[in-house]
Amino acid sequence: MWTGYKILIFSYLTTEIWMEKQYLSQREVDLEAYFTRNHTVLQGTRFKRAIFQGQYCRNFGCCEDRDDGCVTEFYAANALCYCDKFCDRENSDCCPDYKSFCREEKEWPPHTQPWYPEGCFKDGQHYEEGSVIKENCNSCTCSGQQWKCSQHVCLVRSELIEQVNKGDYGWTAQNYSQFWGMTLEDGFKFRLGTLPPSPMLLSMNEMTASLPATTDLPEFFVASYKWPGWTHGPLDQKNCAASWAFSTASVAADRIAIQSKGRYTANLSPQNLISCCAKNRHGCNSGSIDRAWWYLRKRGLVSHACYPLFKDQNATNNGCAMASRSDGRGKRHATKPCPNNVEKSNRIYQCSPPYRVSSNETEIMKEIMQNGPVQAIMQVREDFFHYKTGIYRHVTSTNKESEKYRKLQTHAVKLTGWGTLRGAQGQKEKFWIAANSWGKSWGENGYFRILRGVNESDIEKLIIAAWGQLTSSDEP
């Protein structure tokens, strides 16, 4: 019996000793974690700890023996420090002023609640009251030790990117730095810019290409392959809402180069349109494609090299830097030198009246293959800004406040070809190849693919083209 009691007592004492060691070692574990983020402090002596200035124990109070509640924020290391006697060991986790205050003062102030400085913290950094920082498209102000942020819907939204990339939609989304910090409203206001088509434009009779109905259309076609060096890549409209000007100038330049069989291959100037298309001109605040084509026919454009894009789009308010006059024989000539004085050629390029191509998929393909790229007026929604690669189709936001996150607006692009791919399930997926005007860092080197034959985003609803206005001396 006595032997059993001794075993029981021994087991109890062993357990108590083990628990005490575990308890005492906990601060050691915390200490290791505490100093992992600041290795210089871990290796340092008491002298190194002294380089941090501030009142910690002096504000918080000192504690006898061990007191794990005797702790306060150590802001310089973005961690915690202690003001009890237990902290003063070989690897000290004491606050910087422990030795100068707790050891020297004979009477310690009473133990108080942790002291926190005025202001706010963000990612370990301290900000004073009234500081303002940006969180994507929202401004946050430090007020009463809390961040108070505006509640705008941002153009770049991580949850929408994640939704697209996790879903089986056939395309992938990306966070673009040029869109970061913009609200959804700003994106639609500054990155599109084509006004809805006028009734006159929509009432135009559709024309069909002269290719025979039995023409065998290839599965894959790209205009730049058929006419190398005669078509033009995407430019970047930046925050100038003028897709109406960029798409019109690009389609016209391609058509003139193809029609002249490579004699005139200059890209035409969208800035010329933005600054000079005077009647009802909105410039970088949107415009109409019918007015753009009117200007090309009546006044003409110079090359992009002659009239390049302004770095500061507010400069468009200074008016038109180019003018032309008729020679009485159907041609117009510039009356001013190029705004870019390095470029000497100020030749004026003109087009015939625009015509509407049939919305039939096959007819659009025939037109592109026979005469060159065409202009398409599409409807852009919020997910399109995130497009990186694949065959685009609109993905509806699953956000609970979905209406707040949805917008729809007109945009003008250039269709340059088409193709077909096998989908994940083995089915055929047809697509158009289109050039956007958001620079080559967006999408597939400035281009995008979009579902073909189903009028995705109204891409096939309104197709516009034109002929170059060439005199007999211009033609090859």
Swiss-Prot record:
Tissue and organ distribution: Expressed in the kidney cortex, small intestine and cornea.
Q: List the disulfide bonds.
A: C63-C70, C70-C102, C81-C83, C81-C95, C87-C94, C95-C102
Q: Extract the SUPFAM superfamilies matched here.
A: Cysteine proteinases
PROSITE patterns recorded? SMB_1, SMB_2, THIOL_PROTEASE_ASN
The record ties this protein, via InterPro entries, to: Papain-like_cys_pep_sf (IPR038765), Pept_asp_AS (IPR025661), Peptidase_C1A (IPR013128), Peptidase_C1A_C (IPR000668), Somatomedin_B_dom (IPR001212)
Ordered alphabetically, the record's keywords are: Basement membrane, Cell adhesion, Disulfide bond, Extracellular matrix, Glycoprotein, Secreted
Q: Name the domain of life.
A: Eukaryota
Q: Does the keyword Zinc apply?
A: no
- Residues of the site described as Cleavage: R49, A50
One GO term of the biological process aspect:
cell adhesion
> GO CC terms on record?
basement membrane; extracellular space; lysosome
Cellular localisation: Secreted, Extracellular space, Extracellular matrix, Basement membrane
Report the glycosylation sites.
N38, N175, N314, N360, N455
Q: Which SMART domains match?
A: Pept_C1 (SM00645), SO (SM00201)
Q: Start and end of every SMB domain? A: 59-107
Free-text description of this protein's post-translational modifications in UniProt: It has been suggested that the active SMB domain may be permitted considerable disulfide bond heterogeneity or variability, thus 2 alternate disulfide patterns based on 3D structures are described with 1 disulfide bond conserved in both.
Show the Pfam families listed in the entry: Peptidase_C1
Entry's transmembrane regions: none
MF-aspect GO terms: cysteine-type endopeptidase activity; nucleotide binding
Anything further noted?
A: Antibodies against TINAG are found in sera of patients with tubulointerstitial nephritis, a rare autoimmune disorder that causes acute and chronic renal injury.
Give the record's family classification. Answer: Belongs to the peptidase C1 family.
What is the annotated role of this protein in its UniProt record? Answer: Mediates adhesion of proximal tubule epithelial cells via integrins alpha3-beta1 and alphaV-beta3. This is a non catalytic peptidase C1 family protein.
Q: What is this protein called?
A: Tubulointerstitial nephritis antigen
The beginning of the lineage is: Eukaryota, Metazoa, Chordata, Craniata, Vertebrata
